[in-house]
């Protein structure tokens, strides 16, 4: 589990996060919500050590993040950024990169590493893409490949920055279903999301940021009931109870 305690973070001359206390819990999908520029991506980058904190604590299974090596962090936390380069390699080779934290120098992949790639691609429903160049794949197909890479990393916490952006509705639902499966397998899944109804339907908990501070945190029902979403976004988010549970929409 990752714990953020009174976290402060930002960039030279530009503080972003202030006094954020939050937990990424195993077995749960956490949606990180908030307007553009409120610090969502900064939160994820600080939580896995890509961006140094300026105050507070980041604890990984009770251990301060700065006390872990880069390899140890990578074995604990997988991170899928919003923007990624598209290297001139096959999808299978890209997924194999998830095994880097477990290799010694010089890097030599073992039979079990290749088997893990096969299983991960099968898990995300992309086994047929293994030999195809990454550059030839659609956005939805690439998203599956990146998720498979994160699975081969075997990290108990998965951070995803806007994984549904630019995907059609069907692919968005596939990503959310995959997040749910991962949580059911015991992982902590943290997703920065812009689609509020999608987030509220698909997540267990929600963390709402506003101007770098935590405006609300709790179950999606608790955050909805707080009225903070309407205040922060300036929209009217409503819900209706159906046979399949609460459905959210803009009123």
Language-model regions: role of each:
Residues 33-35:
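The feature captures the beta-strand-to-loop junction immediately N-terminal to the Walker
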Residues 56-64, 73:
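Conserved ABC transporter NBD signature motif
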Residues 96, 111-129, 154:
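Conserved ABC ATPase "signature" region
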């Amino acid at each position: 589990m990752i714990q953020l305690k009174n976290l402060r973070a930002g960039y030279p001359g530009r503080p972003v996060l202030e006094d954020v206390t939050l937990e990424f819990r195993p077995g749960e999908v956490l949606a990180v919500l908030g307007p553009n520029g409120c610090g969502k991506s900064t939160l994820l980058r600080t939580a896995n050590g890509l961006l140094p904190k300026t105050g507070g604590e980041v604890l990984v299974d009770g251990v301060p993040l700065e006390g872990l090596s880069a390899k140890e962090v990578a074995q604990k936390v997988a991170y899928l950024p919003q923007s990624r380069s598209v290297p001139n390699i096959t999808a299978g080779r890209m997924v194999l990169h998830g095994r880097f934290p477990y290799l010694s120098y010089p890097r030599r992949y073992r039979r079990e590493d290749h088997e893990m790639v096969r299983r991960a691609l099968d898990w995300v429903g992309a086994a047929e893409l293994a030999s195809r160049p990454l550059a030839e794949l659609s956005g939805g197909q690439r998203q599956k490949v990146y998720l498979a890479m994160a699975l081969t990393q075997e990290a108990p916490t998965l951070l995803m920055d806007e994984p549904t952006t630019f995907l059609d509705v069907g692919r968005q639902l596939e990503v959310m279903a995959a997040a749910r499966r991962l949580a059911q397998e015991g992982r902590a899944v943290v997703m920065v999301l812009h689609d509020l109804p999608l987030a509220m339907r698909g997540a267990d908990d929600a963390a709402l940021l506003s101007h770098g501070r935590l405006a609300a945190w709790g179950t999606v029902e608790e955050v909805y009931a707080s009225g903070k979403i309407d205040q922060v976004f300036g929209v009217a988010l409503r819900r209706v109870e159906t046979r399949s549970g609460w459905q959210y929409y803009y009123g």
